[in-house]
Amino acid sequence: MPCARGSWLAKLSIVAQLINFGAFCHGRQTQPWPVRFPDPRQEHFIKSLPEYHIVSPVQVDAGGHVLSYGLHHPVTSSRKKRAAGGSGDQLYYRISHEEKDLFFNLTVNWEFLSNGYVVEKRYGNLSHVKMVASSGQPCHLRGTVLQQGTTVGIGTAALSACQGLTGFFHLPHGDFFIEPVKKHPLTEEGSYPHVVYRRQSIRAPETKEPICGLKDSLDNSVKQELQREKWERKTLRSRSLSRRSISKERWVETLVVADTKTVEYHGSENVESYILTIMNMVTGLFHSPSIGNLVHIVVVRLILLEEEEQGLKIVHHAEKTLSSFCKWQKSINPKSDLNPVHHDVAVLITRKDICAGVNRPCETLGLSQLSGMCQPHRSCNINEDSGLPLAFTIAHELGHSFGIQHDGKENDCEPVGRHPYIMSQQIQYDPTPLTWSKCSKEYITRFLDRGRGFCLDDIPSKKGLKSNVIAPGVIYDVHHQCQLQYGPNATFCQEVENVCQTLWCSVKGFCRSKLDAAADGTRCGEKKWCMAGKCITVGKKPESIPGGWGRWSPWSHCSRTCGAGAQSAERLCNNPEPKFGGKYCTGERKRYRLCNVHPCRSDTPTFRQMQCSEFDTVPYKNQFYRWFPVFNAAHPCELYCRPIDEQFSERMLEAVIDGTPCFEGGNSRNVCINGICKRVGCDYEIDSNATEDRCGVCLGDGSACQTVKKLFRQKEGSGYVDIGLIPKGARDIRVMEIKAAGNFLAIRSEDPEKYYLNGGFIIQWNGNYKLAGTVFQYDRKGDLEKLIAPGPTNESVWLQLLFQVTNPGIKYEYTVRKDGLDNDVEKLLYFWQFGRWTECSVTCGTGIRRQAAHCVKKGHGIVKTTFCNPETQPSVRQKKCHEKDCPPRWWAGEWEACSTTCGPYGEKKRTVLCIQTMGSDEQALPATDCQHLLKPKALVSCNRDILCPSDWTVGNWSECSVSCGGGVRIRSVTCAKNLNEPCDKTRKPNSRALCGLQQCPFSRRVLKPNKDIAPSGKNQSTAEHDPFKPIPAPTSRPTPLSTPTVPESMSTSTPTINSLGSTIASQEDANGMGWQNNSTQAEEGSHFPTSSGSTSQVPVTSWSLSIQPDDENVSSSAIGPTSEGDFWATTTSDSGLSSSDAMTWQVTPFYSTMTTDPEVEIHSGSGEDSDQPLNKDKSNSVIWNKIGVPEHDAPMETDAELPLGPPPTSYMGEEPSWPPFSTKMEGSLPAWSFKNETPRDDGMIAEKSRKIPLPLAGDHHPATSEKLENHDKLALPNTTNPTQGFGPVLTEEDASNLIAEGFLLNASDYKHLMKDHSPAYWIVGNWSKCSTTCGLGAYWRSVECSSGVDADCTTIQRPDPAKKCHLRPCAGWRVGNWSKCSRNCSGGFKIREVQCMDSLDHHRSLRPFHCQFLAGAPPPLSMSCNLEPCGEWQVEPWSQCSRSCGGGVQERGVSCPGGLCDWTKRPATTVPCNRHLCCHWATGNWELCNTSCGGGSQKRTIHCIPSENSTTEDQDQCLCDHQVKPPEFQTCNQQACRKSADLTCLKDRLSISFCQTLKSMRKCSVPSVRAQCCLSCPQAPSIHTQRQRKQQLLQNHDML
């Protein structure tokens, strides 16, 4: 018997959470005024509540105006109101609750109660019953709750207004009960106080054992099925069950019984309202379209057990309770279905903690009989009251009554993912409505199609079943829906739009979604709500939409290639689908037809043989067998097979394949369809009554038949002699001898050597012999023989006579058709013939006409195509046709491929044109010609519901490791795995990037102008020394500057000063990856050493000069050209010249080291425009950029950084004087770049910047410049110390040329750069590594003042010497305990839970990829165990049965000698026995003795009856073979008869036969007859003899 687990109902769906009953504790006691509770019980209950409110409800009109303090519904005649349509059923109430006015818009609820609905209160037995017909009172109301100023309901209510307002209402923040203060007098205003209290939890959760004695296995379902079929054969002999797949309305008349604990718990006053509310929810569940049938749950009777009922035992044991309840409810159910309180199913609601199988608490909540509907003794279930989930328990158990099994048990409807079903064993939290699975739909449909719901066809006395639907989103707002999905801390994501299509919830700061739409009724705007995925204006409640049938599907493939297969077509109730309580479709949902009816070849196996052979490759009990079919007459549509050379059979399939013949052999055409044997007529129509006449003409009248009769007269013969030929197609064959003789009939084929009967002088037994396509019945009684066969024969056969004696003559006859010798009519009568041409396929333009071939019967016309051979069917003919020209229309081309294969941005396009058909061509027209038509969409979204595969996820950049001088910053780059696929390593973003490239401040930096600098790029030969020309490497020689060119890796764009830093930062943040477009991009894992590791060649270093003038004294006329081309003058060698040296100078702005602006990264050759905010520092500065240039062609990738020193002081001359700029620069100053690119052997480029603070005007100190002896070469710098080293310097000649080109104003005005003055500043070291490899750690660095005294740097904010770091969580594997081994021997397995956890926070779980970096493989999830081979169980003989009848037990000892036996295969130690009832022989009274004297006999009745009280059904099953049957006859009146004084009668005067005839006609009373037949008609006994017989009877009676 199926049962429901407690966890199945632990989670609720919003579809039916309209009403809840129970209680919920929280809050404080608040009441507006002191109130006294006259009723002690109510006072005790209310005072125990943690919070309650006193309110005074008033009845108002639709506008909120007070009508009356009286709350009772004014309507008194329920029948009148129902007939009137309920125009006055609308009621409005108002209460003030929690400082808010709540308005109740309620309607009288007539929907699920019959007109004859009765409430019974029983007090122990039938003699103490109070019955109340409650359906006439319009007390029960249902509707919505509104707040003041709103038009959309915020909740629902189910109230009773019979005596005040009693019931329940639901608000978004909680559930509340309301009831009047009992026995309280009216207030001064005439109002009546009510108490409102919050729903409390009924009891604390209990830990229950996960044991549920569920018995919905295959064996149990087969057993229940057999019992059901046996009951139907015995009980429903006269009823013809409808077995068509037609959807009809069904009404389940329901009895609900509440036990004493339920009544006590809810109270006699509230229990009815509670139960009716629950049943209302059950009705809604069965109105779900997913059930595929139109089923109404109608309550006809409610029984409230005020005291323990006699004959009904409700205990903890579920099966015992169910057995007792089923027997009790049958006894109180009126047998007549016309009785208004007759019920089809009974539902028990109990507060007992029931458990299936064991007498202790467990998680069982319900129990039912499988497939028990419409069986009076089995249509019942019990349910444990658990509050609101009770509705789901009852619906679940009623499903079992309809034959629905648990999802996932013996079917493939195991709940997948998050979505559960009503018949699931367990249900999780889910905001979507609970539905019935496709398996549940198939189970109940099959149950009803088999006619097993015959008792549900009668319509109860009702006035309509329209459902009052409330959209669930009206009750549960988006926050509540999120809490149902993700727990109590979840909220709605306000940032996400279009909530009607997808509900997004905020969980721990992240927006998450299950990609489900918000529930219907959810608010989506001002006076708008969601309905069917769209945001529409709020109006009235949505009208119910009744379902409509969709189009029939195409016919399926034929199940057979020959021999009459089956095809099916079905339609769905989706045009439209029933919504908002609309009725499900009624009518035929699936139809079948036969196909390929031509016979199969005789040498092919039967269809059942083919199905059995499918199991030849399937092991059965660890062995393989060859199976062949076994026919079961009781179940012709189930597949039973038996192995060859074995003596057992097994049911392989519950239903054979459609089209399998119900009966093999014979003339029956009946086939199995959907497991049911269907009648098939000779026209091969299902459920057809068409029959053949005598000669096999379907629906013929016999006019085409002729009967051939012949007589074989040959008297003598030897051996086998031919009698005559029975032709092919002969029917009604009869052969018989005229008189008995010793001869034998025989049958042979046209082959003289092939005999079918009595051949080879061997005489066969009487019986049926299958030959020539029919069955011949051979019958021999004595020496008289005959043969009978119905035909038709599929070949001609010869009748023969084996002579033994003289032949008295043999008659034989058969019936054939008149129209030819060949009786194979199908080949002669049916043929293909083309029909008419169809209409043109189009109404305009060029179309096609078609001509199809139809199967035609000779002389009758078109018939079904199954009568003709499909292999010879001609192809359809077609020809073109042209109608008038078509008007303009929109044409849509094929959709292009989606722009993305996954993710939320996919779109696909197509071409949409306005065209017109011109003959056979299409002409494009302007779109205005089609503007009157709806234009198809040219752009739609696609693939947005598909998750993208794995991709890289980057974290935030860390702080730079240094504040200046060049450092590194890092970020995490992880693979966010989707679908367990790896990420593309070629697209992995960088995890490291350069930063802090601005030069650290230093002192003693002087410059000397050089007049020989040629900005034009030409090499100017001069006798003066040029200290700015670098000394090339010994292996290279100087090369004249060439025409200015810009390499591809370098950008010619000039960034503005005030946007440099912001551009870099924004681009990196937007892309999630820095340096991505940089030609010097660093690959992951690159290192940045402080010096080059190359020793083969010293790289040539070039320095670039950056000058920042006073931003407040910049003359626009002195700046020169403002275009990018003018600001950049770059000279470089072609990349293909490996030995050339190119010098590039760069003039860039400089910023004070004391600025608070963010750090700026300058990327050499970046290709990205970068902006940096302009610093307001008054000082002018020069920045030296040291640029390493590759020597050969090599990838522009950076894996090493070279620290750069300042320009060498030894080559600096006097400090020039810079005139102040007279005009403030509006905007930003571009950078001047002269870059020297020199090849390097390491193939990489490194760039560093050093900043030189410029002294203020007036502080200039002249100095002499030193000349170089060598005008062509300079010593290469060999150190990176800021205070020493070598490098190029700016000479006076260089400065003069810069002035000439507009770069500098006057060479004499920059001598102030030579001032040896620099303020103190902080010197910071490089950041250390993180102090920890995981978890929270710290970076450290040294911070000291450049002067050596920290006090000198107090005016400058000291950089942080330390900062936090968190590389990754400290992850580790946490393993659970191993489970018990699945087998105790022969190899099992055990499993455990393995989780990636935070090793510091043991309660925090991490994603598995955090643990993939741990050493070693992850801990295994499973391992093998108990590998020892299993031993054999040793069993002892069975003991004697413990009882001789009434169900006993046999026991035996079972042991395992070695202790290693498979416990799953342990033989049973007990077995039931002697289940038959305990019965005995009961004897009746002896009848009168048949004679008065001389020895007569008398009899009595003897019956085998049960020894205990039982029903008539039990009496039919009684067997008394264990007792000796008492005698049924005994002798009597043994005394001799006293002779009469009359003359002795020796014999009858008339003949004995005639006297016996008269006696049988009861004529012995006639004196003349008695005189003539004195012996046959003896004289009547005398008075004395009669008295003696009476005394004898009295004595016999006393003996009994």
From Swiss-Prot:
Biased composition (Low complexity): 1038-1047, 1130-1140
Record-linked InterPro entries: ADAMTS/ADAMTS-like (IPR013273), ADAMTS_ADAMTS-like (IPR050439), ADAMTS_CR_2 (IPR041645), ADAMTS_CR_3 (IPR045371), ADAMTS_spacer1 (IPR010294), MetalloPept_cat_dom_sf (IPR024079), Peptidase_M12B (IPR001590), Peptidase_M12B_N (IPR002870)
Coarse class of the protein's main subcellular location: secreted
Keywords: Cleavage on pair of basic residues, Disulfide bond, Extracellular matrix, Glycoprotein, Hydrolase, Metal-binding, Metalloprotease, Protease, Repeat, Secreted, Signal, Zinc, Zymogen
Enzyme class, first EC level, given as a word: hydrolase
Chain ranges of the PLAC domain: 1541-1581
PTM annotation, UniProt: The precursor is cleaved by a furin endopeptidase. Subjected to an intracellular maturation process yielding a 120 kDa N-terminal fragment containing the metalloproteinase, disintegrin, one TSP type-1 and the Cys-rich domains and a 83 kDa C-terminal fragment containing the spacer 2 and four TSP type-1 domains.
Record-level GO cellular component terms: extracellular region
Free-text comment on the cofactor: Binds 1 zinc ion per subunit.
GO molecular function: metal ion binding; metalloendopeptidase activity
Residue ranges, annotated region (Spacer 2): 1001-1321
Pfam families the UniProt entry points to: ADAMTS_CR_2 (PF17771), ADAMTS_CR_3 (PF19236), ADAMTS_spacer1 (PF05986), Pep_M12B_propep (PF01562), Reprolysin (PF01421), TSP1_ADAMTS (PF19030), TSP_1 (PF00090)
Domain of life (superkingdom): Eukaryota
Motif Cysteine switch, residue range(s) on this chain: 210-217
Protein name: A disintegrin and metalloproteinase with thrombospondin motifs 12
Species per Swiss-Prot/TrEMBL record: Mus musculus (Mouse)
Upper taxonomic lineage: Eukaryota, Metazoa, Chordata, Craniata, Vertebrata
Gene: Adamts12
